[in-house]
Structures are given as structure tokens and as C-alpha cells.
UniProtKB/Swiss-Prot annotation:
Residues 126-677 form the Lipoxygenase domain. Ca(2+) 2 binds at D39, H40, G42, E44. It catalyses: (5Z,8Z,11Z,14Z)-eicosatetraenoate + O2 = (15S)-hydroperoxy-(5Z,8Z,11Z,13E)-eicosatetraenoate; (9Z,12Z)-octadecadienoate + O2 = 13-hydroperoxy-(9Z,11E)-octadecadienoate; (5S)-hydroxy-(6E,8Z,11Z,14Z)-eicosatetraenoate + O2 = (5S)-hydroxy-(15S)-hydroperoxy-(6E,8Z,11Z,13E)-eicosatetraenoate; (5Z,8Z,11Z,14Z)-eicosatetraenoate + O2 = 5-hydroperoxy-(6E,8Z,11Z,14Z)-eicosatetraenoate. It is found in: Cytoplasm, Cytosol; Cell membrane; Cytoplasm, Cytoskeleton; Membrane. The lineage of its organism: Eukaryota, Metazoa, Chordata, Craniata, Vertebrata. Its main location: cytoplasm. It comes from Rattus norvegicus (Rat). This is Polyunsaturated fatty acid lipoxygenase ALOX15B. Its cofactor is Fe cation. Pathway: Lipid metabolism; hydroperoxy eicosatetraenoic acid biosynthesis. The PLAT domain can bind calcium ions; this promotes association with membranes.
């Protein structure tokens, strides 16, 4: 006879409790016990409850290895009646055989319908640490089950592969939005559509009548940052600052030599550079910077409301003023091939010529940001990380425990995006200048150029040579967060991987990395993405990159969308007239005629409003309410990580007090753990 106290914790979410009957068997080194019902008077397993059950086994099972949880509908009172099984969210089981001697079995999963679930004791273990055959078999069966549940598909040829489900209705509860988050998301969407339809804007296919009329749209849920954009969008210094701290802060690079297809001369830029210097001198000093949107050259464009749309592939040269002066644009060329029909626009040109040129650059920023920086780098690639984690790492694996909070809701939001945003005829196709055809072109082109170093912030900053560019808060805050994540990851890796050989010998880890390489990066060796990891250092770098991409990188390029775009002339999603081929032709009327139609503007701004702010049920970076790690040592590392994030946040908020436009997108409490919106 063996006696145990079993404590069960049910989640607090809406619908987490169950009327179903739950039984447990205990698996040990000497065998497995019969199923024992967890039952007492009254209802068990209510939402938020922790309940104790006394369990007596007929025989000793030896050292406890795992629990087998069985759930089934209650018996019907009449033979012809039956109860449909309902879902149950279990947080954990705890098994105590002596006072103070207890084992915790983390679950943090929904159990849908009738069936069973196996829970391991909470200590994290890599595969080579499991010596008992029962535990080895359990790891293998768990992964086989998850591979059946979560499979890959090709959505568009040349894109990273994705989850093979058509709609969010097909998803199981473990990867689906909570009921609260889902309700808030769709209420927010419906209220936005209703407001703009009431204003008579949502169905108008014509041009805006004036910038003044656009102000009606601007009042749509604007923010302090959006107010600043509205007040300063025409200013050169603000235009330049958006390359540093706007929604796409990843393109600007130092220019040591002018591209041959960008023939800027000393005479062109002398009014900005001033006397006593030259282009060559400033190139050598390192005070010139380049933003090149050349990947847009020749990209497929869209037709909106029956009208063809247009795109440019601009190059922008910027000058960092000496001392504490601002970064300023000094030359813009709208196409990649120089010639008489491709003038270089300058700040000294007519006001409307220069403003129109800058607006073409901002349209290019929209296209590259939405297709590449946001969709590809901050959604499709994190989906690969999430899906490979579910398929290749069992729950007891330390990397699963570390990474699973950073995959929360990613598969839901990406499936929803394929339903409502990037599917043919949906928002991207209806209302952006490139449409899904142009987005697809860009993603395929970028996949051929994408490198591992671009995903690793320190290497990316070095490659672009922007480590000392003043006022680059994305870099400053991002590097602090990267360092904090890396320190945390390094501590976790040191706990479970004592040597380089232990990394090489972890076959589950190698399968995880290999699947990311093949399914996400399409086995392109030119990307520099590892297909295996053979050192502790390589593992730390790789996992840091995964967590940073899924949290901070996504926050930086997602949360800023609405602020940048609600005043549409600052970030037009499409352009209805071709880029100018000469100077002196621009006018206020021509400027308005170039901007997107009213309905296209509304569609995009609603989408960006939804995608910029989390609709409740948030989990900020470093917030881990699901306690997958049960050992004291990794829990101390988590606490240290959380303290570091608080320190970083304090510094950011202190700095922001002195800024006219605070940079808040990488303030840790505002960063979500995962790509969930």
C-alpha cells in the first residue's frame, strides 16, 4: 500500500474549469498503478481552484517517473443520455508522499475532450539525461503526437513554411487566443469599422479632397506620438529621425563611398554641408549615411479601385550634423538607374518637389517595413521558431521550458493573418500599393539575401556601422535588451549543458535547429543560418536571437505602426501617380492626387491600429506566470532577468523625460513575450 496526496491546480481563464471526471495513475520504476479517480463531494476542477485528493495505491510503484492523467465525461443519470466532454485547463499536479516531500508536474495545457495526458516531473532534462526506458519512450511518443498535430505547409513558394491549418477555427486551444483576447480583438475591429463607416470614409473610392479633410481621419484614436508626427511630418529632421526610431529602424547604414548609381555632387549638397568641406571629406569622416530601398526596383504593383498603383526604389543620403546637430536628408533619388528622367531631389528645391520626394521614400518605407521587416522577419520567421519548438522539443526539455512563453499565440495571429490580411482579396491585396503579388516578390527576394547576422542585433549594428550614430534609441534600448536576454540564456545553458560535447550530443536540439534551417530558411547555406550547433557559445547566440526576435524585435517594428501611419501622408500605403521625372512640376493638388484613395487609407489604418496594440491578455517580456522550470537554480536566473529588465525600463523612462518624442517601443513592460498580435 502506498498513500499520496495529489494537489491539482486549474487555470483561471474563462472556461478553464471542467465537469468531466479526472483520474490519475502513477508511473514509477516498478510499474504503473491503476487509474484512481480524483473525486470528492461537490464539483471538482473549478476555474482558479487548487484541490487536494488522497490517493491510496495497492502497490508501491518505486521511484515516481510521471503521471498519466485521464479525462472523460461524467456518467449520465439515464442510459440514453450522454454528456459531451468539455475542455479543462490544468496548470499543474503536485504529488506528496511525506509532509514537505513533494514533486511538481507542470502542465499548463488544455485537455480537450476525452483522453489522456502524460506529465513529467518538473526538473528539465535533455535527452541524454533520461536513462530509464519508460522516460525515453515517453519523449518519443510525445514528439510523434505533436508532429501529427502540427505539420508544415508551403503557403507561397519561396516563403518560409508555416503551420498547415487554414483558419483559426482549426486550431486547438493550446495555440489559440484566449476567449477574452479573441473577444477584445474582434470588438476593437468592429468598433473601428463602424466609426469610419459612420464618418462616410470606409466606402469612398475617390481621392482625398485636401490635407484638411484627412484631419478627420487623423482623429481616429490618435496618440501623443501620432500628434507629434502630425505636427512635424514635413520637417527634414523628423523625416531623418524616423530611420532611427520609427517603425523601420533597420535599414540606415553609414556611407563610406557613394554608390555609382547615385551621382550626388558637391554642388548639390553644399548648402547643407556648408563651406570648408566636401562630399569626399564627409565620407571619410563617416558623417554620411545611406538608406537604399533598391530591393523595390521592378517589383510588381497593385490595382486599387480599378486604378494602377506605382512604386519607387529610392536612395536617400543623410548627413549627421556636427556636435549635437540633427541627422538631415541631403539628397533623394527615386529610381536606381541615374539619368535625365531621374533627378536627384534636394532640400534647396521647391517645397512641393522636396516634400513629394520625401513622401515617395516614406511609401517605400511602408512597403519594405510591412512585407519584410514586419511580416517576414517579425511574423513568418517567429512562426518557424514556434512550430519547430512544438514539433522537436518535448515538454521536459530545458529549451522547451525556456522558449514556450515566447511562442504564445504566434500560430494563432499568423493563421489569422493568412485568413484576413494577406490572402488574395484581403487588406494587403485591396489596399496597399504592392498587393500580395508585390509582397510575395519582396519576400522571395529578401529570402535570397537574408543572413543570420541580420537577425542578431549586435552583428547587424556592426555591419551597418551605426554604433555611434547619435539619437538612435532603437539601437541603444535594443542592445540593452539583447544583453539582458543573452545573460539570462547563458545562465540557463550553463545549467543544462556543461560542455560543447553536451550540445552536440543533444539530438532533440539538433533536430530543432535543423528543422528551422530547412523549413524556415529553405536549406539555403548562403544565409549563414546554422543547421546544427556544436558549442555552448553558438547555442547561447542562437537562442538569444530567437527570444529577441519574438519579443523585442517584433515590439519595435509592430507597436509603432499606428503612430506612424494614422497621419497617412507620413507613411502612405500606396501611390496613385508615378514618381516624378523632372523638377518643378509638383503642386499641392498633385501631391493629394498621388496619395492613396480614401477607402484604401481606411483599410490600412484600421489594420495597423489592430496590429499595434495588444487587445488584453498580455504577458510582458520576462513575465512567466506559467512555471515550467521547477528547480531553484533556473528560477533564480529568471528573477535576475526580471530585475535587469526593471533596471533597463527605469533608465529608458528617465531618458524619455527629456525627449520631445519619447521612444517607448522597447520599454520592457511594453514588450510582449511573443508575437501575439
Amino acid at each position: 500500500m502506498a498513500k499520496f496526496r495529489v494537489r491539482v491546480s486549474t487555470g483561471e481563464a474563462c472556461g478553464a474549469g471542467t465537469w468531466d471526471k479526472v483520474s490519475v495513475s502513477i508511473v514509477g520504476t516498478h510499474g504503473e498503478s491503476p487509474l484512481v479517480p480524483l473525486d470528492h463531494l461537490g464539483k471538482e476542477f473549478s476555474a482558479g481552484a487548487e484541490e487536494d485528493f488522497e490517493v491510496t495505491l495497492p502497490q508501491d510503484v518505486g521511484t515516481v517517473l510521471m503521471l498519466r492523467i485521464h479525462k472523460a465525461p461524467p456518467e449520465a443519470p439515464l442510459p440514453l443520455l450522454s454528456f459531451p466532454p468539455d475542455a479543462w485547463y490544468c496548470r499543474w499536479f503536485e504529488l506528496e508522499w511525506l509532509p514537505g516531500a513533494a514533486l511538481r508536474f507542470p502542465c499548463y495545457q488544455w485537455l480537450e475532450g476525452a483522453g489522456e495526458l502524460v506529465l513529467r516531473e518538473g526538473a528539465a532534462k535533455v535527452s541524454w539525461q533520461d536513462h530509464h526506458r519508460t522516460l525515453q519512450d515517453q519523449r518519443q511518443k510525445e514528439l510523434e503526437s505533436r508532429k501529427d498535430m502540427y505539420s508544415w505547409k508551403t503557403y507561397i513558394e519561396g516563403w518560409p513554411h508555416c503551420l498547415d491549418h487554414e483558419t483559426v477555427k482549426d486550431l486547438d486551444l493550446n495555440i489559440k487566443y484566449s476567449a477574452m483576447k479573441n473577444a477584445k480583438f474582434f470588438f476593437k475591429a468592429q468598433s473601428a469599422f463602424t466609426e469610419l463607416k459612420f464618418k462616410g470614409l470606409l466606402d469612398r473610392t475617390g481621392l482625398w479632397r485636401s490635407l484638411r479633410e484627412m484631419k478627420r481621419m487623423f482623429n481616429f484614436h490618435n496618440t501623443p506620438a501620432a500628434e507629434y508626427v502630425f505636427a512635424h511630418w514635413q520637417e527634414d529632421a523628423f523625416f531623418a529621425s524616423q530611420f532611427l526610431n520609427g517603425l523601420n529602424p533597420v535599414l540606415i547604414r553609414r556611407c563610406r563611398r557613394l554608390p555609382e548609381n547615385f551621382p550626388v555632387t558637391d554642388e548639390m549638397v553644399a548648402p547643407v554641408l556648408g563651406p570648408g568641406t566636401s562630399l569626399q571629406a564627409e565620407l571619410e569622416k563617416g558623417s554620411l549615411f545611406l538608406v537604399d530601398h533598391g530591393i523595390l526596383s521592378g517589383v510588381q504593383t497593385n490595382v486599387i479601385n480599378g486604378k494602377p498603383q506605382f512604386s519607387a526604389a529610392p536612395m536617400t543620403l543623410l548627413y549627421q550634423s556636427p556636435g549635437s546637430g540633427p541627422l538631415l536628408p541631403i539628397a533623394i533619388q527615386l529610381k536606381q538607374t541615374p539619368g535625365p528622367d531621374n533627378p536627384i531631389f534636394l532640400p534647396s528645391d521647391d517645397k512641393w518637389d522636396w516634400l513629394l520626394a520625401k513622401t515617395w521614400v516614406r511609401n517605400a518605407e511602408f512597403s519594405i517595413h510591412e512585407a519584410l521587416t514586419h511580416l517576414l522577419h517579425a511574423h513568418l520567421i517567429p512562426e518557424v521558431f514556434a512550430l519547430a519548438t512544438l514539433r522537436q522539443l518535448p515538454h521536459c526539455h530545458p529549451l522547451f521550458k525556456l522558449l514556450i512563453p515566447h511562442t504564445r499565440y504566434t500560430l494563432h495571429i499568423n493563421t489569422l493573418a493568412r485568413e484576413l490580411l494577406i490572402a488574395p482579396g484581403k487588406v494587403v491585396d485591396k489596399s496597399t500599393g504592392l498587393g500580395i503579388g508585390g509582397f510575395s516578390d519582396l519576400i522571395k527576394r529578401n529570402m535570397e539575401q537574408l543572413s543570420y547576422s541580420v537577425l542578431c542585433l549586435p552583428e547587424d549594428i556592426r555591419a551597418r556601422d551605426v554604433g555611434d550614430l547619435p539619437g538612435y534609441y532603437y539601437r541603444d534600448d535594443g542592445m540593452q535588451i539583447w544583453s539582458a536576454i543573452r545573460s539570462f540564456v547563458s545562465e540557463i545553458v550553463d545549467i543544462y549543458y556543461p560542455s560543447d560535447a553536451s550540445v552536440r550530443d543533444d539530438q532533440e536540439l539538433q533536430a530543432w535547429v535543423g528543422e528551422i534551417f530547412s523549413e524556415g530558411f529553405l536549406s539555403q547555406e548562403s544565409s549563414g543560418m546554422p543547421s546544427l550547433l556544436d558549442t555552448q557559445e553558438a547555442l547561447v547566440q542562437y537562442v538569444t536571437m530567437v527570444i529577441f526576435t519574438c519579443s523585442a524585435k517584433h515590439a519595435a517594428v509592430s507597436a509603432s505602426q499606428f503612430d506612424s501611419c494614422v497621419w497617412m501622408p507620413n507613411l502612405p500605403p500606396s501611390m496613385q501617380l508615378p514618381p516624378p521625372t523632372s523638377k518643378g512640376q509638383a503642386s499641392p493638388e498633385g501631391f493629394i492626387a498621388t496619395l492613396p484613395a480614401v477607402n484604401a487609407t481606411c483599410d490600412v489604418i484600421i489594420a495597423l491600429w489592430l496590429l499595434s496594440k495588444e487587445p488584453g491578455d498580455r504577458r510582458p517580456l520576462g513575465h512567466y506566470p506559467d512555471e515550467h522550470f521547477t528547480e531553484e537554480v533556473p528560477r533564480r536566473s529568471i528573477a535576475a532577468f526580471q530585475r535587469k529588465l526593471i533596471q533597463i525600463s527605469s533608465g529608458i523612462r528617465k531618458r524619455n523625460q527629456s525627449l520631445a518624442l519619447p521612444y517607448t517601443y522597447l520599454d520592457p513592460p511594453l514588450i510582449e513575450n511573443s508575437v501575439s498580435i
